[in-house]
Amino acid sequence: MASLVAVQPVAVKGLAGSSISGRKLAVRPSPRALCRTTRRPRAAVVAKYGEKSVYFDLEDIGNTTGQWDLYGSDAPSPYNPLQSKFFETFAGPFTKRGLLLKFLLLGGGSLVAYVSASASPDLLPIKKGPQLPPTPGPRGKI
């Protein structure tokens, strides 16, 4: 903390002194603040590569930023080999967004075509025709 004391200010060229009720005031740091600033830290803070989950090395940018072309590890697959073979074989064509979108559009279109073709034709009121005899309106007209 700083304490305000009435002392003779040092004239600094280009800076005007502050005046409160005619006295020039200068800011002098408290003795506690002086002690804190003169102390040295007990230990320097050093982050080593890989220590405490801090991974940063300018010499090894590949490991620092990650291998962007590699999305897995070299560990063996935790899945059943038959399951892995199935997904590699049959899900291979759908790895691209465009192919997956085309597959979904074709599947959805064929589903709509099948449902509309297999629906009974008399669902629409125009196909069913009138079910009850017409009732006359308020003036006796149909």
UniProtKB/Swiss-Prot annotation:
Subcellular location: Plastid, Chloroplast thylakoid membrane
Entry's transmembrane regions: 101-119
Record keyword Lipid biosynthesis present: no
Transit peptide boundaries: 1-47
Xref: InterPro entries: PSI_PsaH
S-S bridge residues: none
GO cellular component: chloroplast thylakoid membrane; photosystem I reaction center
Topology with respect to the bilayer: Single-pass membrane protein
Keywords: Chloroplast, Membrane, Photosynthesis, Photosystem I, Plastid, Thylakoid, Transit peptide, Transmembrane, Transmembrane helix
Chief localization: plastid
GO BP annotation list: photosynthesis
Family membership noted in the UniProt record: Belongs to the psaH family.
Function statement: Possible role could be the docking of the LHC I antenna complex to the core complex.
Database matches in PANTHER family: PHOTOSYSTEM I REACTION CENTER SUBUNIT VI-2, CHLOROPLASTIC
UniProt protein name: Photosystem I reaction center subunit VI, chloroplastic
Species of the source: Oryza sativa subsp. indica (Rice)
Gene designation: PSAH
